[in-house]
Design a protein with these regions (language model features):
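Compositionally biased low-complexity segments at domain edges in trafficked proteins
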Residues: 129-133
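N-terminal assembly/attachment segments of tailed bacteriophage virion structural proteins
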Residues: 1-128
Length: 133
């Protein structure tokens, strides 16, 4: 299983590290995403909240939306982590896919974290590339 760790701070929506665009192939069906959520560089409290992860194509077509598991540990090493383990729905199409993490609190207020990109290469290339020659 491939594991990608992605950090998001809702106080700094423009900060997007370059490492946030994992590259996988359609063969990769066991992919785990760990999102570490912060607010002002501190773990944010998700008490009573639900977290949803949506994947969209470049054409803004929603591939699917799913609820994620929330792991919150505010003890010695404070961390708020959202975990999602993918299945074949994510890698059924090749191309650039955008992941959007939405937090919905107990009052229904929605917070969207900055999106991340995911490059999915096809199973087999239809045309020869320079590597093939």
């Amino acid at each position: 299983m491939r594991i990608f760790n992605i950090v998001r701070d809702c106080s700094y929506p423009r900060y997007q590290p370059k490492s946030d665009q994992p590259i996988v192939t359609q063969f990769d069906t066991g992919i785990a995403f760990n999102f570490f959520l912060l607010e002002n560089n501190q773990p944010c409290s998700l008490a009573g909240s639900k977290v949803f992860l949506s994947f969209k194509t470049d054409e803004n077509e929603v591939l699917f939306t799913t609820e994620c598991q929330v792991i919150q540990d505010l003890s010695l090493n404070p961390v708020t982590r959202i975990t999602y383990i993918s299945d074949e729905r994510l890698t059924k199409r090749s191309g650039l896919v955008h992941g959007i993490l939405d937090l919905v609190d107990s009052t229904g207020y929605r917070t969207a974290f900055p999106p991340f990109g995911l490059v999915i290469h096809p199973h087999l290339l239809d045309e020869p590339t320079s590597i093939d020659h």
